Amino acid sequence: MAKQAPDVGDYKYGFHDEDVSIFRSERGLTENIVTEISKMKEEPQWMLDFRLKALKLFYKMPMPQWGGDLSELDFDDITYYVKPSEHTERSWDEVPEEIKRTFDKLGIPEAEQKYLAGVSAQYESEVVYHNMEKELEEKGIIFKDTDSALRENEELFREYFASVVPAADNKFAALNSAVWSGGSFIYVPKNVKLDTPLQAYFRINSENMGQFERTLIIADEGASVNYVEGCTAPVYSTSSLHSAVVEIIVHKDAHVRYTTIQNWANNVYNLVTKRTFVHENGNMEWVDGNLGSKLTMKYPNCVLLGEGAKGSTLSIAFAGKGQVQDAGAKMIHKAPNTSSTIVSKSISKNGGKVIYRGIVHFGRKAKGARSNIECDTLILDNESTSDTIPYNEVFNDNISLEHEAKVSKVSEEQLFYLMSRGISEEEATEMIVMGFIEPFTKELPMEYAVEMNRLIKFEMEGSIG
């Protein structure tokens, strides 16, 4: 019996375009396919060796025994590499028309013109467009697609690649390491502070597609950078897989903010590994917005290696019908006087399931370290569920740990108060939800906050009745 495509409903990015790819690998994962990917990219031998070792690890490693249901994920039915065009273009006019129309619908050219210092657009397996303001190059900033960085900055690339997330980290990190393609590479030199965001946009267009970008960010001593990524995919009757790896190195006194606003269709498995090493007095901020997908499993991680290092995660997860958002954070305190903050906001409706899963670890050398965790969940109906699963490891007695968790429903008193002032029940519920997520949206640049609020409103439509 043929599968029915999920209802597009109000998912505004559910459109898909005709296949315009110039190359598409066979479905399934084999040594031949991994070798073919590497040869098409004309990679050095060491990268091919890295990929093949990762593939062997992937075969050996077990599937996660926790989190959402992965039993329907068929690795043999996925296309692991699709090349949409011949080159990464620096001019928007030179991007193939079919691909350009997709990104025009998503507002990428407009976004670049208005408020971005640099932008990268990935379609399927490859970055099809990349541009950066010239003055940033003059400051020594490197912002390239990851494949170009491997070719053009190999020494710097090799120094940091897989140093934060090795292939052996987990099964999906091994998978990414074997078939990675695209992503962003950023290097910010010492004491260079970049205030305007750099942005990347990742789009899956094909059915049964796997997207495996690899992002690597290095903020040198005293540097600062703000990076924003967005993700969407069409609605199909069969599943797609997004399995990215993000590695970030925050050197002494440096600052990195990494913002994600994902709005995947509800046929996408979103299984991502994100980790940063934070050195002395460095500061790492994860700002993570999770909407859509069939299943998201994502836990941004800060490893606080230097004295005074700081890490924070501010996240929102919204699960609707048939969706599981299994998200959270990991804070690993390895040095004295380190600090971390986790603020998790979750919303579930129409039978959706949200799970906060977090780890805070205090090592023996982490004297004077402190961590604060806040988990708030808003459940909009009786069919939806929420779980909070914290795990704390403490190996010294000179630390501070605070954890607060709260689950609530939209109360009749709140609704009555608003409805008595002429507001409909649906509008009142929406107002309560928007107030609930305000601590998240206020941390976004204005244009992203507007988009996030709009996406939440789309998700909210039809919540009453």
From Swiss-Prot:
Annotated Pfam families: SUFBD_core, SufBD_N
Top-level taxonomic group: Bacteria
Family in the record: Belongs to the iron-sulfur cluster assembly SufBD family.
GO biological process, one term: iron-sulfur cluster assembly
Protein name per its UniProtKB record: Iron-sulfur cluster assembly SufBD family protein SERP0500
Transmembrane segments: none
